[in-house]
Structures are given as structure tokens and as C-alpha cells.
Amino acid sequence: MSDYLSVSSLTKYLKLKFDRDPYLERVYLTGQVSNFRRRPNHQYFSLKDEKAVIQATMWSGIYRKLGFELEEGMKINVIGRVQLYEPSGSYSIIIEKAEPDGIGALAVQFEQLKKKLAEAGYFDDRHKQRLSQFVKKIGVVTSPSGAVIRDIITTVSRRFPGVDILLFPTKVQGEGAAQEVADNIRLANERTDLDLLIVGRGGGSIEDLWAFNEEIVVQAIFESHLPIISSVGHETDTTLADFAADRRAATPTAAAELATPVTKADLLAFLKERQMRSYQAVMRLIRQKDEQVKKLQRSVIFRQPERLYDAYVQKLDHLRTHLLTKVRQVYDVYDSKEHLLRQRLLSFNLSGCIQRYQAQLKQDQRLLLSHMSSQYDSKLARFEKAQDALLSLDTTRIVARGYAIVQKDNHIIQSTQQIKKGDRLHLEMKDGQVQVEVENVKQEENI
């Protein structure tokens, strides 16, 4: 019986071989991920090819540092060690490092994070803010020693001198760069004197630009209440920060141009044009009003002011005739009633009653005539008042009071500014006309 090994003895022997074999301590393996189901801590799945399958284990610390998400069917390259699990007698590979086969891990991580953030709405156009036409102060999150800040300062100074630039010195690559970029974006948003923010750096490899692909940077840009222009790398480089920013510029110079869409020269030209338009509009209005005044001066009302009250005279005559007619009609009615009552009373031989009715009738007649007379006097007084007001506008009456109408070239003169020394004037007085020549013009300053 001593020639037979127990299962546990054989398994222990094989495990010892596995653990001591240098070829199994560091194995480079290519396979396709199978039976993958994400777990909170350690990850357990299989690697397979067309002919075989091996179990794989990835501890939580390795998985968190992976940089991309494992997916079912993904082909990956792994480095690890092979070990034997004694209770089941099965072997597996303990993965210490992994990356996608064919493309880099950063590229996969980029696409996976891009998809995640896009689904969360971080890149939606509805969240984009409009850039202001005119800015007073621009914040810049970039390295203080790079060419980016120099290009921005040069371009802004050329396009719109007087715009202030506030630099937030920032580490733009390497460990801690992403956190510093995000912190400075939030710091800029705490200020109230900035109009917009430029976030960027110069060109480099995907590793150099990676800070601008980190989720914390994208989130800081998305949450910014300041409009943000991204300028990361060269024109061919695209980062997740570019997708989240309100505008993307290919170069720092282009970013500065976007930040100052209207140059100082453009603004001065615009103001000059508006000034000219305003002047022309005012002059047109003056000419229109002047033409209206001249048209009024040539109207019949000013040449024949008596026409202003002709209609009132006619209306008064009509009212007088109408009133007299009404008085006669009322009087005739009462006279007829009186005659009828007298006849009726006489037929009854009621002399006392007749006398009372006669007295009442005479009183009613007096009241009626008094009321009618009062109405007539009131309307006549209103007419005479209106007539006097209109007659006061009659130029012949004005002249009759000792005034004169002064004309030059058949136009009435209203101001000393309309005449000058040597002008010949025509004066119309109540008893004749006079031709005079101006020897001196004195203008009153307070008029």
C-alpha cells in the first residue's frame, strides 16, 4: 500500500511544483475574458482561447488601479503567477497586471469614461453657456511657465487692450495634476470679477494630456458657472475636457480670440456708426418738424383766422332760432291749456277755481320764461367768451393794438436769429406798411 499516494499528497506535491517553478512565477498570457461578473471586491473570471480555459483571479487593489473596465469578451494581455488551489485541485492565474490587447489601456479608459459621461449628460449642448461679447477679466488655468499663458496674453493685449488676465498657476501633467486643475477651476468660480475661464496646456502625448481626461476635471468644468474655453494640446488632440467645455479652441491663440470676439477697433467702429445713425435720425426729425411748421404757416387758418369761429357763429344762430321756436311751441301749448281750462271752469261757474288756476298758470309761465331766459343768457355768454378768445388771435386786432407784423421775403419773423444786418424787412401796421433796413441786431441771452 506504500506505493499509492493519497489525493491530498499528490495535490500538495503538485502545488509545491507550481510554487517553485520559475516559469510559473511570472507568466505572460493572452486570452479572452469569459464569465465576468463585476463584484464589490476581488474579481473572478476565466481567460480562454479557441482550445482551452484557465480560471483567473484579480485582487481588489489591482482591479482599482486597472484604469479601464473589464468587459465580457474583451481580449486582454495579463502578467501573473500560476497557483494550484488544493481543496479542488484546480489551478488558476493570479493577475498582477492587465491591459487590453491591441490598443492601450488609456485608449480603452478614454472611450469607457467618455461613454459614461455622455450618458450622464455632461456633454449635452443644452448645458453649454454662451460666451460674452465683451469681457473685462479673463481667468486662465494653466502652467505659469508654458507658452500657453504667453500666447493668451499677447493675443488679448493685441485684440482688446485693457482686458485683465488672472493666472491660476496649475500643474498640468503628472501625479496630482488632475486634482489641481479641478481645484483651480472651482477656485476661479468663487470669484465675482471674472467673465470667463480658459483651461488648457500645450501639446504632448496622451499620457501628458491625461489629466484633462480625468473625471474630476470634467465634473469641475460641467459644474462651472463661468463659461469655459478649453485649449488642450494641438488641433489633432481631443480630451474629455474639450467635450465638457462650452467652447473648444485648437490653440491658445484661438482661445484668446474666442474670449475676445469683438476687438477694440471693432467696438470703436460700431460706436462711430451708431453715432452717425443717431445724428442722421435727429436731422431727419428736425427737417420733418420744420416742414410741418412751414405747412401750418401756409394754411388757411393762419392766413384767415376769422374762419376759426365761423362755425361757432353759425351754430349760435341755429341755437337761437331753435330756442325761440321751442319757446313759442311751449307757450302755445300752455296758452291752449289755459284756454281749455277757462272754458271748462266757466261751464261749471267755478270762478274761485279759475282764479287759482290762472294764478298758477301765470306763475308757471314766469318760471318757464325765466328758465329759458337763463339758459339763453348762459349759452350767449359762452359763445361771446369763445368769440372773444378767437378774435384775440385775429392779426388785424393785434396790429390795431399797436403791434406790427415783421416779414422777410414773405415769411413772418419770430426771432432775431432769423435776421442780420443789412436785411430788408416789411412791417405791417394798423394804418399802413413800412419797408425798413436792419442796421443792428441785438439778441437777448435769457430768451
Curated annotation (Swiss-Prot):
Fetch the Pfam families from UniProt: Exonuc_VII_L, tRNA_anti_2
Q: Name one GO biological process term.
A: DNA catabolic process
Q: Is the keyword Oxidoreductase in the record?
A: no
Reaction(s) the record says it catalyses: Exonucleolytic cleavage in either 5'- to 3'- or 3'- to 5'-direction to yield nucleoside 5'-phosphates
UniProt keywords, alphabetically: Cytoplasm, Exonuclease, Hydrolase, Nuclease
Which EC numbers characterise this protein's activity in its record?
Answer: 3.1.11.6
Recall the GO molecular function terms of this protein's record. Answer: exodeoxyribonuclease VII activity; nucleic acid binding
Please name the InterPro entries in this protein's record: Exonuc_VII_L, Exonuc_VII_lsu_C, OB-fold_nuc-bd_dom
EC primary class: hydrolase
Any one GO CC term of the record: cytoplasm
Q: Where in the cell is it found?
A: Cytoplasm
Quaternary structure annotation from Swiss-Prot or TrEMBL: Heterooligomer composed of large and small subunits.
Enumerate the NCBIfam families for this protein. xseA
Question: What's its job?
Answer: Bidirectionally degrades single-stranded DNA into large acid-insoluble oligonucleotides, which are then degraded further into small acid-soluble oligonucleotides.
HAMAP family named in the record: Exonuc_7_L (MF_00378)
Q: Which PANTHER family match?
A: EXODEOXYRIBONUCLEASE 7 LARGE SUBUNIT (PTHR30008:SF0)
Protein name as catalogued? Exodeoxyribonuclease 7 large subunit
The encoding gene = xseA
